[in-house]
Structures are given as C-alpha cells and as structure tokens.
Amino acid sequence: MQLNPSEISELIKSRIQGLEASADVRNQGTVISVTDGIVRIHGLSDVMQGEMLEFPGNTFGLALNLERDSVGAVILGEYEHISEGDIVKTTGRILEVPVGPELVGRVVDALGNPIDGKGPVNAKLTDAIEKIAPGVIWRKSVSQPVQTGIKSIDAMVPIGRGQRELIIGDRQCGKTAVALDAIINQKGKDLICIYVAIGQKASSIMNVVRKLEETGAMEYTIVVAASASDSAAMQYLAPYAGCTMGEYFRDRGQDALIIYDDLTKQAWAYRQISLLLRRPPGREAYPGDVFYLHSRLLERAARVSEEYVEKFTNGEVKGKSGSLTALPVIETQAGDVTAFVPTNVISITDGQIFLETDLFNAGIRPAINAGVSVSRVGGAAQTKVVKKLSGGIRTDLAQYRELAAFAQFASDLDEATRKQLERGRRVTELLKQPQYQPLQVWELAVSLYAANNGYLDDLDVKQVLPFEKGLRDNLKTSHADLIKRIEDTKDLSKDDEGALRSAIEAFKKSGAY
C-alpha cells in the first residue's frame, strides 16, 4: 500500500491533534522551618487559603498563612519526620471529610478516620469541612421541638430544631451530662446526633461512648473525637468536620443534632496555632478572628426550607425541610461569663443554659439557673401541653428567688410570703433529675400539672420526688389510655384534664408514696 505525500501529512496532522499529554501540573516548595507542628514553606507561589499540602511520607498539612515570601502551614498528624529542605507539593484540593449514613454508630477522628477498631467506614461521599452557611432566603423559622427529656430545660428553656442553644458553666458542673441526656432522649425520634469531643481526656471520651452504647443511643449517633493528646490542628478542625457530617442530613430533608463539647478548647487550640504562625494577638492573646472562628461554625446550624432541600437534591427529595440543631458547650473560669470567648458565643447563639457550681454543690442537679437561662426562639417550638403548663413554674421560681433573698433578713413573714416560699422550695425539688433518666412529654406534663395545681404544697419537701415517681408509675399501670392521648396530641383536653385530676387525687389519697 502506497501513500502519496499529501495523505502522509494529513495522517501526521491527525495523529498530532489526537495526542493527549497527561502532564500533572503541581506547584512545589521547600520546607524552611518546622516548629510545634507549624511549617514555613518557600516557593509555593500558587496556593489557596485552606488548601491541603502534601509532605513526604504521605503526610498532609493545611495552608493558613499566605505571605509574600513564604507560606505558613499546620501539619495534620505527626510531624517528627519532616525536616528542613523537604519538598512540599500543592494538591489543588480543600480539606474534605467522609459524610453519609455509613458514619452513624462510629467513632472517628477530626479527619473522619475510624478510631473505634470496627474496620473502615466505607463512606461513598466526602464534603468540604469549610462551607458557607445557608442564606436568609433558604431558612425557615424554628417550629418543631427537640425534647431533651430534662424537666427544667423542656419546661423553661425549650429548644427547637434548627436552633443554637449554648450550654455554659464552670468545669465539673454537669454540662456534658445535660448534652448526653439530650442525645439519649432522641431514641425513636428520627434525629441523627453528632457528639464532637474537643480536647477531652481519652478516658472521658471512652466513658461517653460506653454510656451511649449501653443506652442504645450509638445506633443514631456519630462521635467525632479530638482528644487532649491530639494536635492543636485536630482540635481546631474537629467541630467543622462534625458540622459537615451533620449538614449531610440537614441538606437531605432530615433532622440532626450536634454537640460541640467544648468550644473553649477549640478556641485555645486556634490561639496556639495563631501565635505559632506569628499572627498578632489581641484580647486574652486570642487572634483578631476568634469571633469569626465560632460564628462561621454556628451559623451553619439552621432550619432550611423545602425549596432548599429540593434544589440541593436536584428534585429527589420534595416537601421536606431539614434542620441542624447545635448545642455548643463553653467552660467558664469561676463563673466569669464576661470573658472573651463566652461573650462571643452568647452573642452568636439563640439563647443559653447557665449551669452554676453553687447549685450543683447544693444538690440541685441539673444545676440550671432558670433566672438567667433563656431560649430566644424555642418558645415557638414548645409542645402545646408543656407551653400551657410551664408558665406557672417559671413565675413561681422567679418569685421564690426574689423572696428567698429578702427572707434571710426578715424574722416574721406574712402567710402569703411563706406560702410562696414553700411552693418555690417544692418546685425546685421537683426540677431535680438523676442523670441518664430523660422524661417523655406526658411525664413532664403530669409533673408540671401537679405543681401548678397545688398537689405538692402540703407534701414534705423530701416527699416530692417519691410522690412524682409513684404518680408516674401509677398512671402507667392504671391510665395507659390517658398517657397515649397526651403523647399523641401533645395537648391536654378538658376531658383529659379532668381524668388527670381525678387520678392524682386518688393516688394522693392512697398515700402509696
């Protein structure tokens, strides 16, 4: 077969046009210095803020400081093998973590790697840990409750799906206990929970996981752990990783609850990284953007509209709104809520639950100070029956606290004042609750009804809790239909109220407590 010259040139041209050059264009730089997990790199001219960088030994870092002559990066993991002169490559990728239902029931680190010894996660999707929160147009007002099962919270500081409610208090006053009770109470309520442990002892995290397994709560919970022995970078990233895992469910029309325990430790880790990167320190040596550190995280918790979910899923999920509820925890020093990080987070969130050491030591547990605890949006999400019955409790407690302060100085009190003080003591006793024993809506309603209608007034203070427990047990055995109606309707009709009154009076007469 002979080819003429024109055919040969055409053939060569077509071959040249069809040639595919697979050159991997990557920017390279050199390590100048390594100090405490912070690396300075020279020669990376084309690098993004927050981009992943590849170091020798399959180690990755995060570019945080972009300067004229060098890049400051934080190493994710071990950095002992990295030395001056090592080659660093850009990856062109922002840090991502695995997301999806495969993570439920697992314990993972801040990068989504399993650390529970149960094998690989096998998640099909990954997502960026830094994302922009949904805009105002895509949000819906909070209207559905998150029942924590804790009497004082559900009655006086209600939490709604899509809300950000801060839990704040000194160390060892029950902040984690409140958060765990909220998770345990979500059994059968179609709410995925994410518990992010930041800077805690590994043994404490293990105890939390064990308790969640014992109560069957791990079936719908993801635990993201960055313990005290992990690097500052891991403690800084863990909340964002947990938030991304929660957003997967929110954006697909499901409900999720995330607990950050605690954000004070994250702020400390970020302060450490910032100071090592030579960023200028401000108040309490925190960097200037520590407010933005927490605001961009907590703004991602939201109730999103049906249109947002439909648009996000390309029409696969219709008519369903999703939510991500955040319960950030902040640790104060000697009750000082005017410190930098506590005031920042108080201003970002939709309310706060104050826990006080004095109340805790006095045996009032959970040690919630109802006077200064507020929920700015949760009232709209409260169930009808609890909303109807809880108003009186808040008033009784407020008046009791005011009168108790004056009663210390007064020797003779009039009858009305003494009655008010006695009622307040019994309500305070009623709101005590053991850990890991969350209550259903009907149980809370019955307790509130008994307190509001004076059934506790003639009891001795020590009899209040036995009476409450005995009453609940009695209703379970003798009035199951009444319980079912309250649970189904989340309301107390006139007929049901009459039946409940008769049941309480009959139980009180029997004296079986």
Curated annotation (Swiss-Prot):
It is a peripheral membrane protein. It catalyses: ATP + H2O + 4 H(+)(in) = ADP + phosphate + 5 H(+)(out). Keywords: ATP synthesis, ATP-binding, Cell inner membrane, Cell membrane, CF(1), Hydrogen ion transport, Ion transport, Membrane, Nucleotide-binding, Translocase, Transport. ATP binds at residues 169-176. Its EC number is 7.1.2.2. The record marks 373 as: Required for activity. It holds the Pfam family ATP-synt_ab_N. Its main location: membrane. GO terms for molecular function: ADP binding; ATP binding; proton-transporting ATP synthase activity, rotational mechanism. Gene3D superfamilies: 2.40.30.20, ATP synthase alpha/beta chain, C-terminal domain (1.20.150.20), P-loop containing nucleotide triphosphate hydrolases (3.40.50.300). GO terms for cellular component: plasma membrane; proton-transporting ATP synthase complex. It is found in: Cell inner membrane. It is an enzyme of class 7 (translocase). Produces ATP from ADP in the presence of a proton gradient across the membrane. The alpha chain is a regulatory subunit. F-type ATPases have 2 components, CF(1) - the catalytic core - and CF(0) - the membrane proton channel. CF(1) has five subunits: alpha(3), beta(3), gamma(1), delta(1), epsilon(1). CF(0) has three main subunits: a(1), b(2) and c(9-12). The alpha and beta chains form an alternating ring which encloses part of the gamma chain. CF(1) is attached to CF(0) by a central stalk formed by the gamma and epsilon chains, while a peripheral stalk is formed by the delta and b chains. Belongs to the ATPase alpha/beta chains family. This is ATP synthase subunit alpha. It comes from Burkholderia cenocepacia (strain HI2424).
